[in-house]
Structures are given as structure tokens and as C-alpha cells.
Amino acid sequence: MLDTVWVVDPIDGTANYSAGNPMAGILVALIHEGAPVAAVSDFPLLGRRLVTCDGSPLRSVGGPATGFGGGEEAMGFDEARGHVGCSSHLPTDIFHELRETGLRPRMTGSVGLDNAFVAQGVFDGAINFSPHPWDNAAGALQIQAAGGVVTDPEGNPWTAQSRGMVAGTPQVHATIVDILSRHTGSFHR
């Protein structure tokens, strides 16, 4: 792989878009040496756009900039909400374990929107098993810029070569990684 590359997902949530569902977007990230350094996630049918560069705060149009900046409570687990974006590829036993912890899995049909919702504080976490950097690079940088935790499903730092991503508030992220650690090998597609 080249040291610096652009990755673009021109229609993230393709099935949603083709069905007239507005939960679809355009994801663009600049990756340098395996890590995203600039990112734009645009959801034109929802009127939302997130923009950031490495070391800069998250900027948002059409929604909150972040749900992570409001002090200790904002960084914790909100039991009343606890929404976690997840893929339809999530094994049923993992889905049920998430529910047993009080988390509430949600499937938007768009990895990029799940990640944007984490960065904006709409979701407390997200999990997906996409091995494609165009699905996760923009969201990884945006969630980190918002103060969230981002890793691969095993809890290692996320890179463009990772097979999936887990992100969220520190507590929700730790809960998801703990659940996945008991299911090693069952979630790679």
C-alpha cells in the first residue's frame, strides 16, 4: 500500500439509498501510513456532515458536534439510551450478550452513519466487521476527534488493515471488546 492514499465510499449504505431510505452517505478519508489524517462524512439526505483533520476538533453541520465533551457523565454509559450501531453480520449470540448488558443494538444499514452517530453522541458505541478502510477510516478519525475510543474487534489500535472496528465511550467500548473476546473467530466474515 502507498504511504498516503485517499479512500472513498461514494454511497455508504447502498441498499438503503437504492430503496429510498435516507440513511446513506459519502465517506472520504486521507490515510497516511495506515492511519486516517483527514475525514469527511456527508449524509446529504439527512442534512448532516462531519469534518476533521488529525489533531483538530470535530466539526459538524446538521447535528451536534460531539456527545463526548460534556464531562464525566457524557463519557459514561447512559443506561436509558445505550444505543450501539451494529452490522447485520453480528452473530446472534453476541447481539443477545450486548442486550444483556443493557446496551441496545441498532442497525442503520450504514457503517458510516453508525460511526457518525457515535462521533455525535447519538449512539454510545458501534461495532462492525467490515475489512474495508473506506467504511471505517473517516469514522475512526471523527470518533477519536470527539473523544471516543476506536480499536479493531480484538481491542488493538484501528488501522486501515483492520478487519472491523469497535468504537464508543470508554465504558461501552470496553464492554463490547470484552464480549467479543469470548467469541474470538466467530465474527470474521
Where are these regions (language model features)?
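Short loop segments at secondary-structure junctions
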Residues: 31-35, 45, 54-57, 89, ...
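DPxDG-like acidic metal-binding loop motif
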Residues: 2-55
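Active-site glycine-rich loop that binds ribose-phosphate moieties when present
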Residues: 28, 67-69
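An extended, acidic
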Residues: 73-189
